[in-house]
Amino acid sequence: MKYDFTSIIDRHGKDAIAVDGLVPGGHGPQPPKEGFDIIPMWVADMNFPTVPTITQAIAQRIQHPFFGYFATSDDYYNAIIHWQEQRNGVTGLTKECIGYENGVLGGVISALNVLCSKGDNVLLHSPTYIGFTGCLTNNGYHIVHSPLVKDEAGIYRMDFADMEKKIVENNIHATVFCSPHNPCGRVWERWELEKAMELFQKHDVMVICDEIWSDIILEGHKHIPMQSISEDARQRTVALYAPSKTFNLAGLIGSYHIIYNKALRDRVDKESSLSHYNSMNVLSMHALVGAYTQEGSDWVDELRQTITGNVDYACGFIAQHFPGVKVQKPQGTYMLFLDCTEWCEAHGKTIDQVQQAGWDVGVAWQDGRAFHGPCHIR
């Protein structure tokens, strides 16, 4: 491979919550037992150095010693348009349809604020990304879950009958959709998205689609943007993206929305701008331009190969050494969602004991119950 995905780099003291946040009173219960180092496998943050074009773009901009007010560059918009066309087959995207968001979750709330009233019911699938749960609850929205169900092959699927039932019974007119799905790792097939959009159109449900993981698709799978499903989907959907998951840029801050519906776009732009908080950082702008290049695309292709190999190894190891721990190999993202129900029953253990055993030897992982997995670890 051309890029380095094997070096172990010490991130301690370098602004990495993945390791520095694991202290008593922080994000970890206590340090591991003597002789064990921390292996950060909790927050969605990779331990790979980012693509060189990003650091080069930032370094070049820093050489100019002025960081005053600025306008978003055409290079920024053109980089997004080209990236979406190259990676996702998107056509007809113009700069007018792109809007800056400090973060995907902030974009979710801005969109909900113009689509709903406080206290409205909003449809989400469960298991559920913990960020959705916190943001929607904190902002006064009521979450109605439609559980994903496993098919005969153990693959998580949408339960369309349950979705329709929940939509009708709860008078729902907005959904927050995750594609690819976190934490289950599903990369939805076209027929699944088409069927979901048919339901949303039938019952006048607006769609807020978090596609932040759309670049991290494991080999053998393909991401399909929700807005590409139909003209109605294009007009009904607020799509949210960011280079942060793909290139390890969460600390730089910077996401964006794509909204083709002008009336909806104008309202979301207005909502996002009300506090003047939702403002771009100049270095973040240059980082995106550095990321969304041909070299960035080549780097992502090698990243996908690396993650695919790591996932294959991890799932094979778990199946061989921990019978009873069920894990569906993710099709996208780099998260594993471990169902420990059978293993715990067979060994007389609780999920708390299993999690603690991991922390004792330095495996920093997350309680799956926060993601609506009753006996799970993410």
Q: Could you tell me what each predicted segment is?
A:
Residues 56, 230-308, 315-316, 320:
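Conserved core segment of the aminotransferase class I/II
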Residues 67-198, 215-216, 221-229:
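Conserved core of the PLP fold type I
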Residues 141, 202-205, 234-235:
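A short helix->loop->beta-strand "cap" motif at the edges of active sites that frequently abuts
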Residues 324-326, 338-378:
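Conserved C-terminal alpha-helix-loop-beta "cap" of PLP-dependent enzymes
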Residues 2-103, 110, 293-294:
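N-terminal small-domain helix-loop-helix segment of the aminotransferase-like
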Residues 124, 145, 209, 365-367:
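Hydrophobic residues in well-ordered beta-strands that form the structural core
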Residues 289, 305-315, 327-341, 375:
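Conserved glycine-rich beta-strand-loop-beta hairpin in the small C-terminal domain of fold type I
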